[in-house]
């Protein structure tokens, strides 16, 4: 009989969106696989009365509390309340803000949502997301000439999710699936090879992914799509293309999207 996981509630409080606290809480919780965490984000808290109501609910649920208040009054109230009611509490933002204040000898703005200001970077990110969708899967070869990054790879090497992740970082990304016996668009040969990244994997990983995909669609997993010999030829053909282009090749087997994206971004510097 499977052992039931311990369940813990986590409240994320903010006078802005609460993304920062949410990311920190999830990152820390990921280190405890045997515990079931229930996350409840409470953004845009601007009054003591609303904060008090939420904190009292946290007491009833014996929740852990993460906060990213920039309003000193709200921040102090949350800290005092949690201390008095023995709630586990983490003020995520204040230590970092204080560190910057000490180093710069300047007072913080104490204005919530500064990281979400509608500035040029924000609009660049939106534009990059639209670009990634428009030029996904080699839909329009013209996109390769406009892109900051071009991803090439056989199917199931995470080209689309990687494109969207990089777009969220502000990069315009176009990707092309490498299909056997299909001609490579002329535009690829006109792109600076430093902007092109070849995505590969192991034949075992690709075989497993493709078999599971066929099963999910109710199809026979024993097909040319998932055949080991066919996969081996696909990967060899892709490797030969990468060598001709002279691009960086990344093996995505056992790598997260974030890890692959980091390698790409660092290579562009």
Curated annotation (Swiss-Prot):
Q: Which GO terms describe its molecular function?
A: ADP binding; ATP binding; phosphotransferase activity, phosphate group as acceptor; protein serine/threonine kinase activity
* Keyword tags: Kinase, Nucleotide-binding, Serine/threonine-protein kinase, Transferase
Residues binding ADP are 153-160
The keyword Mitochondrion belongs to this UniProt entry's keyword annotation: no
Q: What's the Enzyme Commission number for this chain?
A: 2.7.11.32, 2.7.4.27
Report the domain of life of the source organism. Bacteria
Under the heading Pfam families, the entry gives: Kinase-PPPase
Write out the catalysed reaction. Answer: N(tele)-phospho-L-histidyl/L-threonyl-[pyruvate, phosphate dikinase] + ADP = N(tele)-phospho-L-histidyl/O-phospho-L-threonyl-[pyruvate, phosphate dikinase] + AMP + H(+); N(tele)-phospho-L-histidyl/O-phospho-L-threonyl-[pyruvate, phosphate dikinase] + phosphate + H(+) = N(tele)-phospho-L-histidyl/L-threonyl-[pyruvate, phosphate dikinase] + diphosphate
Q: What family does the database annotate?
A: Belongs to the pyruvate, phosphate/water dikinase regulatory protein family. PDRP subfamily.
Q: What does this protein do?
A: Bifunctional serine/threonine kinase and phosphorylase involved in the regulation of the pyruvate, phosphate dikinase (PPDK) by catalyzing its phosphorylation/dephosphorylation.
Q: What NCBIfam families does the annotation carry?
A: PRK05339.1
Report what the protein is called: Putative pyruvate, phosphate dikinase regulatory protein
Q: Name the species this protein comes from.
A: Pediococcus pentosaceus (strain ATCC 25745 / CCUG 21536 / LMG 10740 / 183-1w)
